[in-house]
């Protein structure tokens, strides 16, 4: 059975030859510290200690929505003015805080020291601190570091930096059996759904990175095949490839078409025949297509504008254009990795306006001129646009919410339909 998608108005273009506008100017994005919000829930025995300012602490606390007395698996070592002025030894204070933390929380098996804008400005070497503390607390606790700074980055790069720092700690694969490594944080329910699908297809062994426990790190080697579940992990992929792993070219598992292409890439790599693939995936495809049908009437023909924010913009645009018949006014993304997104770019309608980077004032001008039905943007732009009568969808919600796979295809469509329904009720 084939996937039913709305045909494009024009054939897709070669991803290499697509015209992309590159912009550089004032940006409107969160920093990489935001990734801690979903990573601390995913790796259940890890702790994320941000070395930063009170602003860093407020950002994570507000975004996570977790009360401090609940003892979440993240915290901030707050740098005071005397630290920034170099009047105290920040390393001594950091050692004291880490010792206090690990004494109080013996359940921590993996500690990330997370750099921020303030710690990078004063050149605090967290890599040396992590090495020093690892020697002290090994083997009970592994201590690593990465940067969550917002200097020239966007918020999803925090996960990439985190996972890349963990790659050297992955054990080497001991046998020559091919294995599949799915990389990128997924909600546990989505991970379980994919695992059942891989089992039914006869694909295995399958491992997920990041794992739910740091004591169950996946192995990697020359026979490891990488399947990207998130498009914002170039450093992690590069680090895994340096360990010998090979990346599978695939679209991302958003919507029916994306999920089918994603699973097919794995099936082809493991020699699964087409008949088996169709038999296993058909019930899920049919159910997902039926569920999407309820949203086509609401979203079909609606015009959408993507501001660059999460790096999910291109897969989302493909899903909305091909499966829900939405019209793409402009698709902006902070960074465009042409190799990793090649399968997605092939599926975008010809002639769609693509933008890499951000000059927020120019993009706001184009959005106001176009007057789309809905704009996907960061929180900082949402309220001003809503005040101007432009319906918005927060891009960060698309990272926090389980949207991958067949079972979540309709949920993903609803995320875009809901703001339009709300706007219609408000003006009625």
UniProtKB/Swiss-Prot annotation:
Cofactor: [4Fe-4S] cluster
Pathway, per record: Porphyrin-containing compound metabolism; bacteriochlorophyll biosynthesis (light-independent)
Function: Component of the dark-operative protochlorophyllide reductase (DPOR) that uses Mg-ATP and reduced ferredoxin to reduce ring D of protochlorophyllide (Pchlide) to form chlorophyllide a (Chlide). This reaction is light-independent. The NB-protein (BchN-BchB) is the catalytic component of the complex.
Binding site residues for [4Fe-4S] cluster: 31, 56, 117
Family in the record: Belongs to the BchN/ChlN family.
Reactions that this protein is recorded to catalyse: chlorophyllide a + oxidized 2[4Fe-4S]-[ferredoxin] + 2 ADP + 2 phosphate = protochlorophyllide a + reduced 2[4Fe-4S]-[ferredoxin] + 2 ATP + 2 H2O
Organism of provenance: Rhodopseudomonas palustris (strain HaA2)
EC code: 1.3.7.7
Name by which UniProt lists this protein: Light-independent protochlorophyllide reductase subunit N
Entry's Gene Ontology molecular function annotations: 4 iron, 4 sulfur cluster binding; ATP binding; metal ion binding; oxidoreductase activity, acting on iron-sulfur proteins as donors; oxidoreductase activity, acting on the CH-CH group of donors, iron-sulfur protein as acceptor
Pfam families in UniProt: Oxidored_nitro
InterPro entries noted in UniProt: LIPOR_BchN/ChlN, Nase/OxRdtase_comp1, Protochl_reductN
UniProt remark on cofactor binding: Binds 1 [4Fe-4S] cluster per heterodimer. The cluster is bound at the heterodimer interface by residues from both subunits.
Keywords (A to Z) from UniProt: 4Fe-4S, ATP-binding, Bacteriochlorophyll biosynthesis, Chlorophyll biosynthesis, Iron, Iron-sulfur, Metal-binding, Nucleotide-binding, Oxidoreductase, Photosynthesis
GO BP term, example: light-independent bacteriochlorophyll biosynthetic process
Source organism superkingdom: Bacteria
Gene3D superfamilies referenced in this protein's UniProt entry, alphabetically: Nitrogenase molybdenum iron protein domain
Lineage, uppermost ranks: Bacteria, Pseudomonadati, Pseudomonadota, Alphaproteobacteria, Hyphomicrobiales
Subunit structure: Protochlorophyllide reductase is composed of three subunits; BchL, BchN and BchB. Forms a heterotetramer of two BchB and two BchN subunits.
Coiled-coil positions: none
């Amino acid at each position: 059975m084939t996937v039913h998608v709305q045909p494009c108005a024009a054939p897709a273009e070669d991803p290499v030859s697509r015209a992309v506008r590159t912009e550089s100017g004032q940006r409107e994005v969160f920093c990489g510290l935001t990734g801690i919000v979903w990573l601390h829930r995913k790796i259940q025995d890890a702790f994320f200690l941000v070395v930063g300012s009170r602003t860093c602490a407020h950002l994570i606390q507000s975004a996570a929505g977790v009360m401090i007395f609940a003892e979440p698996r993240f915290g901030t070592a707050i740098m005071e003015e005397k630290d920034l002025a170099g009047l105290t030894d920040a390393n001594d204070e950091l050692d004291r805080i880490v010792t206090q933390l690990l004494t109080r929380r013996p359940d921590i098996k993996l500690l990330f020291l997370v750099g921020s804008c303030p710690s990078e400005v004063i050149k605090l070497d967290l890599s040396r601190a992590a090495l020093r503390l690892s020697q002290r607390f090994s083997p009970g606790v592994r201590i690593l570091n990465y940067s969550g700074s917002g200097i020239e980055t966007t918020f999803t790069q925090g996960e990439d930096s985190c996972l890349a720092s963990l790659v050297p700690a992955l054990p080497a694969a001991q046998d020559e059996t091919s294995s599949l490594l799915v990389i990128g944080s997924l909600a546990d329910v989505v991970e379980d759904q994919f695992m059942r699908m891989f089992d039914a297809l006869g694909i295995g062994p399958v491992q997920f990175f990041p794992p739910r426990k740091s004591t169950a790190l996946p192995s990697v080697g020359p026979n490891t095949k990488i399947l990207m579940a998130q498009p914002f992990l170039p450093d992690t992929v590069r680090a895994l490839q340096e360990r010998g792993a090979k990346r599978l070219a695939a679209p991302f598992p958003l919507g029916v078409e994306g999920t089918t292409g994603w699973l097919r890439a794995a099936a082809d790599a493991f020699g699964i025949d087409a008949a088996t693939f169709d038999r296993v995936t058909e019930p899920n495809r049919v159910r997902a297509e039926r569920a999407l049908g309820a949203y086509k009437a609401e979203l079909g023909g609606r015009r959408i504008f993507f501001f660059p924010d999460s790096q999910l913009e291109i897969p989302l645009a493909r899903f909305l254009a091909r499966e829900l018949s939405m019209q793409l006014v402009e698709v902006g993304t902070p960074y465009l990795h042409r190799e990793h997104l090649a399968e997605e770019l092939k599926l975008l309608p010809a002639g769609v306006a693509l933008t890499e980077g951000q000059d927020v004032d120019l993009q706001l001008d184009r959005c106001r001129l176009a007057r789309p039905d809905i704009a996907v943007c960061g929180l900082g732009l949402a309220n001003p646009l809503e005040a101007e009568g432009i319906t918005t969808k927060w891009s960060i919600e698309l990272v926090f919410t389980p949207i991958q796979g067949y079972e979540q295809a309709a949920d993903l469509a609803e995320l875009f339909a809901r703001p339009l329904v709300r706007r219609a009720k408000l003006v009625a």
